[in-house]
Amino acid sequence: DMFDYTDESDGTKRLFDLIPIFYENGRESLILIDEIDRSLHTNLTRKFLELFFEIVEDRECQLVATTHDSNLLDLELLRQDEIWFVERQVDHSSKVFSLNKFKERFDKKIDKEYLLGRYGAIPIFDDDFVLEDAYEE
């Protein structure tokens, strides 16, 4: 029996969205993916990136992706200059900065340090935070 696409999980559908990237034939290309980890297990997202980097190794291809998956902040997967943070400012603008700015050792656990707030770009809640307050802005 053929499967019905509408019966598939969000993760399976997401994979169908991402797979064509591997068949990009252009020698020079820029690929943008918002929320690369959406509906995917962190290990699957990591494997996707590893395969992508292997396939495009001899091409002039650049991937720009956003994620909320801090497990991808790994210097065995990405170079320091490939990891960028976005931090919301008080005036609601965004500040973008590279991990390179922090001059970290290559053996450092970036994901743990990030979650501890070392690099900024994490949500900060005060003791009086109430969800309804977010809707009043």
Roles of regions detected by a PLM:
Residues 33-34, 67:
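Active-site flanking residues adjacent to catalytic metal/cofactor-binding acidic residues
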Residues 28-30, 62:
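Residue-level preference for the first positions of well-ordered beta-strands
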Residues 1-23, 30, 36-40:
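Conserved ABC ATPase signature
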Residues 24-25, 55:
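Histidine kinase transmitter module recognition
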Residues 43-50:
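Conserved D-loop/post-Walker B switch-helix segment of ABC ATPase nucleotide-binding domains
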Residues 39-41, 72-73:
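Catalytic P-loop NTPase motifs of RecA-like helicase/translocase cores
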Residues 50-137:
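C-terminal lobe/lid and adjacent interdomain/linker elements of RecA-like ASCE P-loop ATPase modules
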